[in-house]
């Protein structure tokens, strides 16, 4: 049985007979067989079954057109069977349904337990391949490929030998399980095929053995022997690729982007011994010390490079000051490896830096206070000018209490305000 030719039919009314269901599914094409699942204890139908067509295209048409079909009291559910449903169908039909393989499906030699040595030992490749189940011949020798195992058998030959020992319904079950996995968990299926390339070959080889695909398709997917895969030996491009292992050689020189305050571009030169053998590579500039009027770190200081992407780390531009009294002569007073020690004039004392910061803060506070006082005085002056500009007629119109207050304020003002207002 080809699982791709079978459709699952669910939500079947209990009073509907098999002949009625078959008549419905004949609308998509000729029906090869229909199996209605019956409860063995009660003898009543369970409400679902399996319809088999002669080709996958007709089965796909039934899924598209007959899903949610109105069957009287219910609407039919039509879909491709899952791996669990195919397993139930195999148990329902039994080995006698196929009739052309002698071994039982539950044979102990085909169970998937911890004993992986249940298969017979691999024979040399010079012996003919097994043909016990009438499978088609193996692809041409030019497309067998694969690396030879210690026994002298090619890897693809060994995959075919294992598949040739399986019964036809076991291969169908394997293909249906792979199909269900690809539909339900495509990411896990992709990871499975990437980590187990032999499984990918086994799937296509099984499809070829069951005549579900042509030989030319498998031949196009295989790589002939002697052809090197692209990217097998990539040249050293000077960066760490996530696909490379850490045991590979150290990459070539990396140009560091130019930084402000006199830092020039540099290349990887050495690994700092202060971090041990697992430290990140460091970039070193020419030995000439290029100072700055601001007292910044000289250009000869080394810049640590990130081992993951080859860019300078943040700590390279903001190095932490070392503890006083613990400075290493090899690294200078700044705690950074340098080929030349900068002069004392280019390094500020911590006490002077603290004093300068405090003075700057005090000056900023004084400027803020002065600005606020000036704004307040300007506002008062504007109000007084408006008050003195009032005429006697305007003052007489005001209420008595406001009139009295304005007169008191005008009398209390100095004579200079009165002169300016006039």
From Swiss-Prot:
It comes from the Eukaryota. One of its GO terms (cellular component) is Mei2 nuclear dot complex. Residues 5-83 form the RRM domain. GO terms for biological process: co-transcriptional mRNA 3'-end processing, cleavage and polyadenylation pathway; nuclear mRNA surveillance of meiosis-specific transcripts. Residues 337-358 are annotated as: Disordered. Keywords: Nucleus, RNA-binding. Its main location: nucleus. SUPFAM superfamilies: RNA-binding domain, RBD. InterPro entries: CSTF2_hinge, CSTF_C, CSTF_C_sf, Nucleotide-bd_a/b_plait_sf, RBD_domain_sf, RRM_dom. Transmembrane segments: none annotated. It is found in: Nucleus. GO terms for molecular function: mRNA binding. This is Uncharacterized RNA-binding protein C644.16. It comes from Schizosaccharomyces pombe (strain 972 / ATCC 24843).
């Amino acid at each position: 049985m080809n699982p791709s030719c079978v459709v699952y039919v669910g939500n079947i009314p209990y009073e509907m007979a098999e002949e009625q269901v078959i008549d419905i599914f004949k609308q998509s094409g000729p029906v090869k067989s229909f199996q209605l699942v019956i409860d063995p204890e009660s003898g009543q139908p369970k409400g679902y079954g399996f319809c088999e067509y002669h080709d996958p295209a007709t089965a796909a048409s039934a899924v598209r057109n007959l899903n949610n079909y109105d069957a009287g009291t219910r609407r039919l559910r039509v879909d491709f069977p899952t791996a669990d449903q195919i397993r139930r169908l195999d148990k329902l039909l039994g080995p006698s349904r196929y009739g052309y393989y002698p071994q039982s499906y539950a044979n102990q030699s085909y169970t998937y337990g911890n004993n992986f040595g249940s298969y017979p030992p691999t024979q040399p490749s010079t012996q003919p391949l097994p043909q016990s189940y009438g499978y088609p011949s193996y692809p041409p020798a030019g497309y067998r490929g694969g690396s030879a195992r210690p026994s002298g058998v090619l890897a693809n030959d060994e995959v075919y030998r294992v598949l040739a020992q399986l019964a036809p319904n076991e291969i169908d079950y394997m293909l249906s399980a792979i199909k269900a996995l690809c539909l339900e968990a495509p990411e896990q299926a992709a990871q499975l095929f990437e980590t187990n390339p032999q499984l990918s070959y086994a799937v296509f080889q099984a499809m070829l053995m069951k005549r579900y695909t042509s030989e030319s398709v498998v031949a196009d997917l295989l790589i002939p022997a002697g052809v090197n895969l692209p990217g097998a030996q990539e040249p050293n491009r000077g960066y760490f690729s996530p696909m490379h292992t850490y045991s590979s050689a150290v990459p070539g020189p990396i140009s560091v982007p130019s930084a402000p305050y006199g830092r020039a571009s540099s290349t990887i030169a050495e690994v700092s011994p202060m971090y041990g053998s697992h430290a990140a590579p460091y970039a070193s500039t020419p030995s000439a010390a290029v100072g700055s009027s601001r007292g910044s770190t000289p250009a000869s200081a080394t810049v640590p490079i990130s081992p993951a992407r080859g860019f300078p780390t943040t700590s390279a531009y903001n190095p932490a000051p070392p503890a006083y009294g613990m400075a290493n002569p090899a690294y200078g007073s700044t705690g950074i490896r340098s080929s030349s020690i900068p002069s004392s004039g280019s390094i500020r004392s911590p006490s002077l830096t603290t004093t300068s910061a405090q003075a700057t803060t005090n000056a900023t506070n004084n400027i803020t206070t002065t600005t606020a006082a000036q704004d307040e005085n300007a506002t008062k002056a504007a109000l007084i000018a408006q008050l003195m500009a009032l005429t006697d007629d305007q003052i007489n119109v005001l209420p008595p209490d406001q009139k009295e207050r304005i007169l008191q304020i005008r009398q209390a003002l100095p004579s200079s305000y009165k002169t300016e207002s006039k």
